[in-house]
Amino acid sequence: LVIDKRSHKGGNLYCEDVDGIHVHKYGAHIFHTDNKDVWDYVNALVPFNGFINSPLARFQDKLYNLPFNMNTFHQLWGVATPAEAREKIKEQCAAYSHIVTPSNLEEQALKLCGKDVYERLIKGYTEKQWGRSAKELPAFIIRRVPLRFVYDNNYFNDRYQGIPEGGYNELID
């Protein structure tokens, strides 16, 4: 028995057909797994495309790769190696070492990734998302910031990724 709160099947995966386009009513959902058996199973039900999510963030008319990775760090500081990026982050975080227990999201982010990443790539997005200042948000919201020291813009680390070619409704049916 599956009980869905919404008036349609599929919950947040529900897709609406708008002029032949599958629109994810509640935001994009990208299926991802490292388990080949799971991937083979869902692909036996419906075909998936090979969509890879490689988002960009814009700050002051410059584009930055997400999640935070070596491409991002090169864009921010011109560094080329993981050691250089780690050193730059360590230097920036040192300015906030006096913060033992962060009392808000801003302090937590500054302690985890430093001023540049926070101000250019976290602060504005977070405040827009929550409709409040990062200083008013609890620290637990951003317990960790994934910092990847590889040149890979793939949002997920999983080997198998995609979206059902016919939309999620076909998979759910």
Question: What residue spans do the PLM features occupy?
Answer:
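Short, electropositive, low-hydrophobicity segments enriched in small/polar residues
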Residues: 14-15, 31, 135, 171
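Active-site/ligand-binding neighborhood in enzyme catalytic cores
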Residues: 62, 71-173
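Short glycine/serine/threonine-biased micro-segments
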Residues: 8-9, 25, 165
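Glycine-rich FAD pyrophosphate-binding loop
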Residues: 1-18
